[in-house]
């Protein structure tokens, strides 16, 4: 028997056990009845107006069904005649109203049920809540803690956060250029925008001639995206669908999927899995924008950064902090600081070797491939020094029919809101030019929408090695906006002499300008004023 079929059978058995356990939970509630229930219909949702649906109080009968709970409504004084039957399923919307009332949407009816006692209302509510457990968890829910998802969608529901991303002009302009520069891929096509946010990428697709765009957004930003769609009069082109791509249904397959699913170190937030999941709606030979991502990894040397983190941890080395000995927490403090990836930017000359490239193919890789990412490393060291850890950045490519466009977060490219990421070693290693540094980076996905990152490095031919495990969910945002400083020791000439030589050259240029009758303005060679008239014709 193959492993695949065995795994499938086990999964099916587990699902059956889950359904059976829910059925068992519902059994005590089977055939339960609630008498004296007054049923009202909501006649005006905006004004919250109600009217009695039946002339007298009713009896509700609940019985278990394979699809949920079958609800039968009968008059109290004529229980032999069923007025209406409804199926309470996992998708039924309901809410408690006070102690005795309960609002529920059943088929095309929006009802308010008023029970004779608190106990009856609580028991009926329990029936509905138990049915909810019949709904299989989506792929997203299975891999994500509820608290993490709530925080995540709340964060991206703020206009300020959308603005932060939209004002990353490298990001936004690159996407627009990639889409408009490949209009042939969008003209009269159906497009899916995954995690649409404000809907900016959907608008780009319409600008490129898309016939229809489905903009999927799970946060509250969906309502703002809808406002933008309506105010820009493109509601006939863009359809905003609130929800997760793992849980919603589309009316048709799509020709192109667009998204901005990249996080720090490419994989953080685990949005890439959602992007890959969306391929279930992609037609054969459809396009993905972006098409693939390259994670770059390089060893670096930065004594200043290492000392900064080390000295922070030394706070816990005080034996008399306001009369309290903190030293017992020094080891844990050190571990915590070095578990933080550093988010900032740097001069690429701190890198000690050419970066290793790990490719994620968005068209072909599977979601499961991103659960554990094991990247082998081999670096041929170009400069002698102390290796303090590994630096990470990524590039993504938009492979279009007309042109290929790259979005890069490299330290050699214009800065983006992704910056770069560095992972420190608590025990740095000294390595010489010409030696080979080997090892691995292991990214293990967790349910907090992030990864535990383990780095293991070893100098080939020696017993020297170092390792660390970091929490990508808890980075240290170090970027201050200050210009990036060149690494120490990169000057091959005297900076002082270079400066004075430059000033002397500028002084000679100004002197020559005066002799020629012109003087540069504010040191700018292209702006000048004529001084000969004043010299030859003084007032």
UniProtKB/Swiss-Prot annotation:
Provide the assembly information.
Answer: Homodimer.
Q: Which Pfam families match?
A: PrmA, PRMT_C
Reaction catalysis annotation: L-arginyl-[protein] + 2 S-adenosyl-L-methionine = N(omega),N(omega)-dimethyl-L-arginyl-[protein] + 2 S-adenosyl-L-homocysteine + 2 H(+)
Enzyme nomenclature, EC number: 2.1.1.319
User: How does the record describe the protein's post-translational processing?
Assistant: The dimethylated protein is the major form.
Family annotation (InterPro entries): Arg_MeTrfase (IPR025799), PH-like_dom_sf (IPR011993), PRMT_dom (IPR055135), SAM-dependent_MTases_sf (IPR029063)
Q: Which GO terms describe its molecular function?
A: histone H3R17 methyltransferase activity; histone H3R2 methyltransferase activity; histone H3R26 methyltransferase activity; protein-arginine omega-N asymmetric methyltransferase activity; protein-arginine omega-N monomethyltransferase activity
For this entry, list what GO says about its biological process.
chromatin remodeling; peptidyl-arginine methylation, to asymmetrical-dimethyl arginine; positive regulation of ecdysone receptor signaling pathway; positive regulation of transcription by RNA polymerase II; regulation of DNA-templated transcription
Q: Tell me which residues bind S-adenosyl-L-methionine.
A: 162, 171, 195, 217, 246, 274
User: Which of UniProt's keywords are assigned here?
Assistant: Chromatin regulator, Cytoplasm, Methylation, Methyltransferase, Nucleus, S-adenosyl-L-methionine, Transcription, Transcription regulation, Transferase
* Protein's name according to its UniProt entry: Histone-arginine methyltransferase CARMER
> Gene Ontology cellular component?
cytoplasm; cytosol; histone methyltransferase complex; nucleus
Taxonomic source organism: Drosophila mojavensis (Fruit fly)
UniProt domain SAM-dependent MTase PRMT-type: residue ranges: 149-458
Q: Member of which family?
A: Belongs to the class I-like SAM-binding methyltransferase superfamily. Protein arginine N-methyltransferase family.
Q: Where in the cell is it found?
A: Cytoplasm; Nucleus
* Record SUPFAM superfamilies: S-adenosyl-L-methionine-dependent methyltransferases (SSF53335)
């Amino acid at each position: 028997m193959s492993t695949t079929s065995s795994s499938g059978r086990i999964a099916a058995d587990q699902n059956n056990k889950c359904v059976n356990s829910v059925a068992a939970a519902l059994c005590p509630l089977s055939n339960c009845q609630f008498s004296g229930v007054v049923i009202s219909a909501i006649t005006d949702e905006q004004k919250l107006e109600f009217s009695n649906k039946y002339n007298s109080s009713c009896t509700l009968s609940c019985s278990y069904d394979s699809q949920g709970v079958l609800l039968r409504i009968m008059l109290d004084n004529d229980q032999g005649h069923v007025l209406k039957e409804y199926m309470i399923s996992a998708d039924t919307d309901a809410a408690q109203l006070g102690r005795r009332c309960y609002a529920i949407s059943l088929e095309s009816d929006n009802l308010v049920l008023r029970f004779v006692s608190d106990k009856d209302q609580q028991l009926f509510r329990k029936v509905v809540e138990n049915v909810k457990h019949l709904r299989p968890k989506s792929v997203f829910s299975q891999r994500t803690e509820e608290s993490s998802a709530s925080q995540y969608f709340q964060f991206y529901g703020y206009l300020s956060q959308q603005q932060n991303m939209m004002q990353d002009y490298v990001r936004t302009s690159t996407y627009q250029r990639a889409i408009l520069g490949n209009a042939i891929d969008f003209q009269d096509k159906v497009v899916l925008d995954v995690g649409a946010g404000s809907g900016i990428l959907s608008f780009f697709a319409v600008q490129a001639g898309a016939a229809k765009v489905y903009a999927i957004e799970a946060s509250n930003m969906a309502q703002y995206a809808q406002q933008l769609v309506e105010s820009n009069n493109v509601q006939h082109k863009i359809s905003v669908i609130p929800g997760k791509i793992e849980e919603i249904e589309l009316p048709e397959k799509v020709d192109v999927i667009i998204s901005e699913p990249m996080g720090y170190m490419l994989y953080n937030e685990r949005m890439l899995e959602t992007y890959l999941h969306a391929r279930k709606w992609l037609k054969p030979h459809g396009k993905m924008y972006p098409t693939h991502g390259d994670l770059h990894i390089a060893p670096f040397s930065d004594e200043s950064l290492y000392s900064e983190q080390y000295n922070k941890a030394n706070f816990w080395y005080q034996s008399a902090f306001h009369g309290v000995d903190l030293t017992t927490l020094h080891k844990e403090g050190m571990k915590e600081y070095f578990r933080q990836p550093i988010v900032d930017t740097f001069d690429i000359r701190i890198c000690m070797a050419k970066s290793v490239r790990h490719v994620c193919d968005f068209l072909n890789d599977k979601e499961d491939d991103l659960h554990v990412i094991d990247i082998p490393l081999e670096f041929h060291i170009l400069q002698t020094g102390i290796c303090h850890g590994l630096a990470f950045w990524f590039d993504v490519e938009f492979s279009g029919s007309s042109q290929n466009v790259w979005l890069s977060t490299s330290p050699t490219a214009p800065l983006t809101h992704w910056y770069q990421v560095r992972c420190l070693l608590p025990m740095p290693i000294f390595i010489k030019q010409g030696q080979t540094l080997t090892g691995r980076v292991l990214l293990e996905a967790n349910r907090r929408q992030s990864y535990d990152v383990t780095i293991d490095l070893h100098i080939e031919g020696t017993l020297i090695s170092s390792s660390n495990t970091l929490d990508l969910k808890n980075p240290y945002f170090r970027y201050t906006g200050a210009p990036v400083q060149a690494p120490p020791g990169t000057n091959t000439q005297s900076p002082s002499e270079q400066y004075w030589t430059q000033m002397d050259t500028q002084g000679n240029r100004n002197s020559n300008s005066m002799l020629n009758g012109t003087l540069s303005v504010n040191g700018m060679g292209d702006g000048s004023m004529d001084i000969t008239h004043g010299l030859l014709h003084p007032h």
